[in-house]
Regions:
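Low-complexity, S/T/G/P-rich flexible repeat/linker segments used as non-globular hinges
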Residues: 141-162
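N-terminal single-pass transmembrane signal-anchor helix
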Residues: 8-35
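Extracellular/periplasmic head regions of type IV pilus-like filament subunits
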Residues: 63-146
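N-terminal secretory signal peptides that target proteins for export/translocation
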Residues: 1-6
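Membrane-proximal N-terminal amphipathic helix
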Residues: 40-69
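Aromatic side chains
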Residues: 12, 35, 61-62, 120-122
């Protein structure tokens, strides 16, 4: 027996199906680029947050060592791009203090990276200003930069002083 649809039966015709697919395709072409933009903005924001967190933790370390009489920041990495890579992150910061590595300063046990898992560049330096008979003032500077070309925050950096 053949099943024949009755005139009043419910269902889609091919034309209705094609129109529905076309409308969904049009909507997706608008939504997907927006989603990609939102994702990139969120990754850039997370990268900036991670750079700021590193700065705050290193400044906390500086204040702790200052209270112990030997104020210093973790030294700049000596690799070509000054990256906070695993080798640098596992080196002891100062032999004069309790042996601590940069990784151990963070509660997660490792230095935060960018959204792509690439380490940030880090450098530190001092600037000494002589104040005449009042002595001198030493400013400690930190610069943290995202040097990953595939990162949405490429070349964004934070420079701060204590």
């Amino acid at each position: 027996m053949k099943n024949k649809l009755k005139k009043g039966s419910k269902g889609f015709t091919i034309a209705e199906f094609v129109v529905t697919i076309a409308l969904m395709g049009t909507m997706m072409s608008v939504v997907l680029p927006s989603f990609d933009s939102i994702t990139l903005n969120m990754q850039a924001s997370q990268n900036k947050t991670n750079m700021d967190m590193i700065r705050q933790v290193f400044f906390g370390y500086f204040y702790d060592t200052h209270m112990k009489g030997v104020a210093h920041l973790p030294p700049s990495p000596t690799n070509e791009e000054s990256l906070m890579d695993e080798e640098w992150a596992n080196e002891i910061i100062s032999a004069d203090m309790i042996p601590t590595t940069p990784n151990e300063l963070f509660s997660a046990g490792e230095i935060p990276t960018n959204a792509n898992g690439h380490p940030f560049a880090y450098e530190t330096w001092t600037d000494t200003t002589f104040l005449g008979s009042d002595g001198m003032k030493v400013d400690y500077y930190v610069r943290i930069t995202d040097v990953d070309e595939d990162s949405p925050s490429f070349e964004v950096s934070f420079t701060s002083a204590i």
